[in-house]
């Protein structure tokens, strides 16, 4: 990664990063050619001031009275965070081929996203031989060799909870840049900076904690106040 770009990325807060990625996702799907921060606010439910702040944090100055150029803004966000555009693909793998991992074997899920699954791994050798997939499936013992030969950058971890930590450590050691963790396991500090936790149970608990005690009619006010404070 370009060192100067990395320093600039670190100056953007984590909440802003998350919002900007979601914003780019929305922009990539809209049919509008231009859009104002007020219009964006009506779609994503953040304040227009917060949206302008986030956009300014990546150095994008393309906003005028009639709004932002949608394509330029979307491209600027993707470029700033080195997110793969749909026209190019970053290679990924699935680690853990149980029920959840098997559901992800449908590569159509990732069509047009800029990410491509090129390999699957599981500690159970029999499972890799029985399952059918559009991409090769390997025993977990082959992770190091395949990640290197295929130049895989990202991994989706869907293994058993007890296998998650050693598999995550192995992936990072092999050069994986980031892991989407679908397990309930809490991964160690050596890999935590490269992990996005996506366990449905963890997300539901986090959501429950966030909305606990918030009346439905006050939820929108509370959410905007929280984002404005970030």
Task: Briefly describe each language-model feature range.
Residues 1-35:
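Extreme N-terminal segment that seeds HTH/winged-HTH DNA-binding domains in transcriptional regulators
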Residues 44, 98, 184-187:
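Glycine-rich beta-alpha junction loops
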Residues 23-32, 130, 134-230:
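Phosphate-bearing ligand-interacting subdomains
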């Amino acid at each position: 990664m370009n060192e100067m770009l990395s320093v600039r990325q670190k100056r953007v807060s984590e909440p802003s990063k998350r919002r900007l990625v979601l914003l780019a996702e929305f922009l990539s799907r809209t049919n509008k050619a231009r859009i104002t921060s007020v219009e964006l606010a009506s779609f994503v439910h953040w304040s227009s001031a917060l949206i302008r702040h986030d956009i300014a944090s990546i150095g994008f100055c393309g906003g005028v009275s009639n709004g932002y150029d949608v394509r330029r803004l979307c491209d600027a966000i993707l470029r700033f965070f080195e997110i793969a555009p749909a026209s190019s693909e970053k290679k990924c793998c699935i680690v853990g081929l149980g029920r959840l991992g098997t559901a992800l074997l449908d590569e159509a899920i990732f069509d047009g996203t800029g990410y491509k699954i090129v390999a699957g791994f599981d500690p159970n050798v029999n499972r890799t031989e029985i399952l059918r997939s559009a991409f090769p499936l390997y025993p977990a013992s082959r992770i190091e060799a395949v990640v290197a030969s295929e130049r895989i950058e990202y991994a989706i971890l869907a293994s058993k909870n007890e296998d998650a930590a050693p598999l995550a450590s192995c992936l990072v050691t092999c050069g994986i840049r980031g892991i989407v963790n679908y397990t309930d396991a809490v991964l160690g500090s050596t890999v935590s900076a490269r992990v996005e936790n996506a366990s449905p149970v963890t997300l539901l608990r986090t959501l429950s904690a966030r909305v606990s005690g918030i009346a439905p009619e006050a939820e929108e006010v509370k959410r905007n106040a929280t984002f404005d404070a970030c």
